[in-house]
A protein has these predicted regions:
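Glycine-rich beta-alpha loop elements in corrinoid/cobalamin-binding modules
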Residues: 1-26, 228, 232, 236
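Radical SAM [4Fe-4S] cluster-binding motif and immediate context
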Residues: 35-195, 200, 215
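Flexible glycine/acidic-rich beta-alpha junction loops that bind and position SAM and/or redox cofactors
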Residues: 62, 113, 166, 170-171, ...
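Short, hinge-like loop/turn segments at secondary-structure boundaries
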Residues: 4-7, 174-175, 213-215, 243-247
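Conserved ATP/PPi-binding loop(s) of AMP-dependent carboxylate-activating enzymes
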Residues: 26-38
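Acidic/polar loop patches that form or flank catalytic/metal-binding clefts of enzymes
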Residues: 9-10, 99, 130, 195, ...
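Radical SAM enzyme core and accessory elements
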Residues: 19-20, 237-313
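Short, electropositive alpha-helical surface patch
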Residues: 116-122, 206-223
Length: 313
């Protein structure tokens, strides 16, 4: 090995020493892997979950304070071959009769050139499948939305986190509430179902900011909001550093046991009452409406995300 050839551990790329020094050299990544569904699992998941999942890209260049993706997948974005993705979809349709696919990229609309090429490939190969993905409210225009819709896009799950600009800045987001409104309108105009996933009471999300988020939700049309309280603290994130400074966690805490950051003035019941008073579709994790999805999935054989049935004008 490297040591037998006289190389020290500090000379080996991506190797860490006990004192925290990392190996030198250029970081390397695995080449694009073969995209293929596992035959023994495909039928089970299609029946039970109503969709299959596939990844089109790995890596995330964003700076969200709570997110572990950059440290797990790297910050360099690597994409899969669109032809291989299309071929795999066609094979799954033929062998299992699937009609819905969810692209599990951390953020789908990173790299517009690649996404356009992927959508054009899906159209050219006539995959004729409905699909959804996680989107950022920033980085999509009307032309792209129309193309994605033509390629089968039916559901967008926006990682919005807040409808308050001050909180978005504190969370390390690269978009504003204005971007959220524009992206929502683009989806609505093209007939694409969309939902907003929110983190309330996270780092920097004050009581006043939460109230602004709830009030701004009145401006969202034909959608559903899924709010979550606080942030899970993961190692190697900015949130972990901030939480340690505030004494919320120890500096040597390995965070193997789940730890969460929740603003001191966050009141879940107050938030719940204010959200429901808007008349909009706010679905909290313990909401009885969540059981509707199980009923539709198992008893009526509905496919794809089922939150579209929870939307309100």
């Amino acid at each position: 090995g490297a040591l037998e050839r006289g190389r020290t551990e500090i000379d080996i790329p991506s190797v860490y020493t006990r004192d925290g020094r990392r190996g030198s050299g250029r970081r390397s990544y695995l080449p694009s892997i073969e995209v293929q569904f596992e035959p023994e699992l495909t039928g089970y998941y299609w029946k039970r979950s109503g969709m299959l999942n596939i990844q089109t890209k790995r890596g995330c260049p964003y700076d969200c304070i709570y997110c572990s993706y950059p440290s797990i997948d790297g910050r360099c974005v690597r994409t899969m071959d669109p032809e291989a993705i299309a071929e795999n979809i066609l094979r799954a349709k033929r062998d299992y009769g699937i009609s819905y696919l969810f692209f599990t990229d951390s953020v789908f609309n990173i790299g517009p050139e690649y996404n356009v090429r992927l959508a054009e490939t899906l159209i050219r190969r006539r995959t004729d499948i409905r699909w959804g993905a996680y989107f950022s409210p920033r980085g999509i225009d009307a032309e792209q939305m129309r193309l994605f819709r033509a390629s089968g896009l039916t559901h967008i799950e926006f990682g919005t986190e807040s409808f308050c600009d001050r909180t978005l800045e504190a969370y390390g987001k690269r978009f504003t509430f204005g971007d959220v409104e524009r992206a929502s309108r683009l989806a609505l105009d093209e007939g694409v179902y969309y939902a907003h996933f929110l983190i309330l009471g996270g780092y920097g999300d004050t009581r006043e900011n939460v109230r602004e988020t709830i009030e701004n939700s009145r401006r969202m049309e034909y959608t559903v909001m899924f709010p979550y309280a606080g942030m899970r603290i993961y190692p190697h994130t900015r949130l972990a550093e901030l939480a340690a400074k505030e004494g919320a966690i120890g500096r040597d805490d390995d965070l193997m046991a789940p730890s969460y950051y929740i603003s001191r003035d966050f009141d879940l019941e107050e938030v719940r009452r204010a959200a429901l008073a808007t008349g909009k579709a706010w679905v909290f994790p313990d909401d009885p409406q969540s059981a509707l999805a199980d009923t539709l999935r198992l008893k009526r054989n509905k496919k794809g995300p089922l939150w579209e049935y929870l939307r309100k004008p």
